[in-house]
Curated annotation (Swiss-Prot):
Function (record text): Specifically methylates position 2 of adenine 2503 in 23S rRNA and position 2 of adenine 37 in tRNAs. m2A2503 modification seems to play a crucial role in the proofreading step occurring at the peptidyl transferase center and thus would serve to optimize ribosomal fidelity.
Source organism phylogeny: Bacteria, Pseudomonadati, Thermodesulfobacteriota, Syntrophia, Syntrophales
Source organism (scientific name): Syntrophus aciditrophicus (strain SB)
Domain of life assignment: Bacteria
Required cofactor(s): [4Fe-4S] cluster
Keywords on record: 4Fe-4S, Cytoplasm, Disulfide bond, Iron, Iron-sulfur, Metal-binding, Methyltransferase, rRNA processing, S-adenosyl-L-methionine, Transferase, tRNA processing
Catalytic machinery residues: 94, 336
Name under which the protein is recorded: Dual-specificity RNA methyltransferase RlmN
Length: 348
């Protein structure tokens, strides 16, 4: 533990500039430090050889660099990899690397556990422990890049791991700004998708603060079904949620994504599909249809392939783009709704 020293990876460029100035050093040193942290992946100030020894000594005295530690990696038969990270306080989170034809997609977490209580989600079973710091969000990407030193790179980032990103808004926003900064990880905002259960005021705030891709975990065409599956809907019902979606800025040809987990006998009938079409009328969007991924002691079942295809065909008939998403990593509990760092934590 680094008691009383600030983790410099929790700081923005402006904060590092202020910090460096307080040490009597030139502000441009902050940009050098950012480059070392994110472009070079420096794990210590001693690696930052463009800084004088005196500056490095000062930084070592006042600050530290801490990153999540890879505790375990599991590989699925389809190539998906689930990474268990140990944090400084011995909490555990999970990230997922999903292989594409020419690159990787990184699915990262924003909280230790989750308090949203969605009934179809394994993460909800472990409860909520705490929010992740900016360094713990960006640190997942840095460590995943270390893990993939050669070959295809990480090109896309989805904030769909453990936790509700908009319930950890300030830290998530700060992390995204570091991820997209020229002095940070340098990702385009077009390559980042944030998934939310639907905290409506924060969707509106996100639209004012950033321009990233937004995915809504919808999962039901009516308030009664959605409130049963997702307690957040009792506070932010569908009419208010969809109004926020209609107002969300989508430059160019971007579209909102609605994620719809198909659960047998709950939300997957042809009548549900017809209601969904009416609900989303007028919103520029696409739908990701996801077969419910079963987990230990879950109360729900995966629908048949026939049910899934029939649901998709109704959406397509109404001119919606509806993609049936392959459930990657199901055999290692790395698929949608299956992450739970606690499950592996107890075995370490």
């Amino acid at each position: 533990m680094h008691m009383n020293r600030i983790n410099i990876r929790d700081m923005s460029l402006e904060e590092i500039e202020s910090f460096i100035s307080s040490l009597g050093k030139e502000k441009y040193r902050a940009r050098q430090i950012m480059k070392w942290l994110y472009s070079q992946g420096a794990k210590s100030f001693d690696e930052m050889t463009t800084l004088s020894r005196a500056v490095r000594d000062q930084l070592n005295e006042m600050a530290c660099i801490t990153l999540p530690e890879i505790a375990r990696v599991q590989q699925s038969s389809d190539g998906t990899r689930k990474i268990l990270f140990r944090l400084q306080d011995n909490s555990f989170i999970e990230s997922v690397l999903i292989p594409g034809k020419h690159n990787w997609t990184a699915c990262i977490s924003t909280q230790v556990g989750c308090h949203m209580g969605c009934r179809f989600c394994f993460t909800a079973r472990q409860g909520f422990r705490r929010n992740l710091k900016p360094s713990e969000i960006t640190g997942q990407l840095t460590m995943l890049q270390f893990y993939l030193p050669e070959g295809p790179e990480i090109k896309n980032i989805v904030m769909m791991g453990m936790g509700e990103p908009l319930a950890n808004y300030r830290n998530t926003l700060k992390a995204i700004r570091i991820i997209t900064s020229d002095y940070g990880l340098g990702f385009s905002t077009r390559k980042i998708t944030l998934s939310t259960s639907g905290i409506t005021p924060m969707i509106e705030q996100l639209g004012r603060d950033l321009c990233i891709n937004l995915a809504i975990s919808l999962n039901a065409p009516t308030d009664s079904i959605r409130s049963e599956l997702m307690p957040v809907n009792r506070k932010y019902p569908l009419d208010r949620l969809l109004q926020a979606c209609r107002n969300y800025p989508m430059p160019g040809r971007r579209m909102l994504t609605f994620e719809y987990i198909l659960i047998d006998g709950v939300n997957s009938s042809p009548a549900h599909a017809e209601m969904l079409c009416r609900l989303l009328k007028g919103i520029r969007c696409k739908l990701n249809l996801i077969r419910f991924n079963e987990f230990p002691d879950c109360p729900f079942k995966t629908p048949s392939e026939e049910t899934v295809l029939a649901f998709q065909q109704i959406l397509v008939k109404h001119h919606y783009t509806a993609i049936i998403r392959a459930s990657r990593g199901r055999d290692i509990l790395a698929a949608c709704g299956q992450l739970s760092g606690k499950a592996l934590e107890e075995k370490l």
